[in-house]
């Protein structure tokens, strides 16, 4: 029997952490971060980690598990998340995956093989390279490759191209989980307002000092490439004013949120909830209760 888990995804600043904590309290659960940047110690403000108080109220996992000089990959995430979920389940609790790194979460849920002749990172990189293509462009690539896909859809096209590219069937190897995937969303202008406000709050909380510490110590590591830090480096180099750097960060975060939504919409089977609608949290909790009781 597959393990039932709750997955909460959505764009940055939409309220994933708050909902995950509420779900954990309601259903005796623990939160597993699905965020590629929250693994780094010392990067707290720019990655929007749950506060110490929130982490004390509900156990959180895969936060602060790497130094900023260390790399972290989808392979690492899947391996560590599997062990974490198994541990949570063994204690009779519910695992709640919450985060915005779609590639990591999708790899976990769909059970992609992490070994074999083709390195997993190469497979993931190829999948990510196909993501920007429109449906028409993907159809053209399929045609060029001499492939036939009855009832074309995006997922089938990407799968067929992947098999053709690597010369082997990389179909899911072992699906361990039965997930309920909840995707939070908001009306676009409201979401962008939330993002702008969050960035302002981050600066008030000390983001500039945190980013400067990263810039001074390790400006070229993987951890420094995340949204929230690299946008401020031109300011530290004297290439932009502070206001220009802050606006650059807001703009980059808005674009990132748009890419996140595109990923969840096209690559994962999610149930969308508009956070601005009345009673939305109650509806989500009811759906989770029905899912767990089924």
Curated annotation (Swiss-Prot):
Its cofactor is Mg(2+). ATP binds at residues 10-17. Keywords: ATP-binding, Magnesium, Nucleotide-binding, Transferase, tRNA processing. Residues 35-38 are annotated as: Interaction with substrate tRNA. NCBIfam families: miaA. This is tRNA dimethylallyltransferase. It holds the Pfam family IPPT. It comes from Streptococcus pneumoniae (strain ATCC 700669 / Spain 23F-1). Its EC number is 2.5.1.75. GO terms for biological process: tRNA modification. The record marks 101, 127 as: Interaction with substrate tRNA. InterPro entries: Dimethylallyltransferase (IPR039657), IPT (IPR018022), P-loop_NTPase (IPR027417). SUPFAM superfamilies: P-loop containing nucleoside triphosphate hydrolases. Monomer. Belongs to the IPP transferase family. GO terms for molecular function: ATP binding; tRNA dimethylallyltransferase activity. It catalyses: adenosine(37) in tRNA + dimethylallyl diphosphate = N(6)-dimethylallyladenosine(37) in tRNA + diphosphate. Substrate binds at residues 12-17. Catalyzes the transfer of a dimethylallyl group onto the adenine at position 37 in tRNAs that read codons beginning with uridine, leading to the formation of N6-(dimethylallyl)adenosine (i(6)A).
């Amino acid at each position: 029997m597959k393990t039932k888990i709750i997955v909460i995804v959505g764009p940055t600043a939409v309220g994933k952490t708050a909902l995950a904590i509420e779900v954990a309290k309601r259903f005796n659960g623990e939160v597993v971060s699905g965020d590629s940047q929250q693994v780094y110690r010392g990067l707290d403000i720019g990655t929007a980690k749950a506060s110490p108080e929130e982490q004390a109220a509900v156990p959180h996992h895969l936060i602060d598990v790497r130094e900023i000089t260390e790399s972290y990959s989808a392979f690492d995430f899947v391996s560590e998340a599997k062990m974490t979920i198994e541990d949570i389940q063994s204690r009779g609790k519910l695992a709640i995956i919450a985060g915005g790194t779609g590639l990591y979460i999708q790899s976990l849920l769909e059970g992609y093989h992490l070994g074999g002749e083709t390195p997993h990172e190469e497979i993931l990189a190829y999948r990510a390279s196909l993501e920007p293509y429109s449906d028409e462009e993907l159809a053209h690539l399929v045609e060029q490759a001499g492939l036939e896909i009855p009832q074309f859809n995006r997922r089938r096209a990407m799968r067929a191209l992947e098999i053709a590219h690597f010369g082997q069937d990389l179909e899911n190897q072992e699906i361990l989980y039965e997930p309920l995937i909840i995707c939070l969303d908001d009306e676009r202008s409201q979401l962008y307002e939330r993002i702008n406000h969050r960035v302002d709050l981050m600066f008030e909380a000390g983001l500039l000092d945190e980013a400067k510490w990263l810039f001074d110590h390790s400006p070229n590591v993987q951890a420094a490439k995340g949204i929230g830090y690299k946008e401020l480096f031109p300011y530290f180099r004297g290439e932009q004013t502070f206001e220009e750097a802050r606006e650059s960060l807001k703009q980059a975060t808005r674009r990132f949120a748009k890419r996140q939504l595109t990923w969840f919409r096209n690559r994962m089977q999610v149930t969308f909830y508009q956070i601005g609608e009345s009673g939305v949290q109650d509806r989500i909790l009811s759906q989770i209760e029905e899912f767990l009781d089924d």
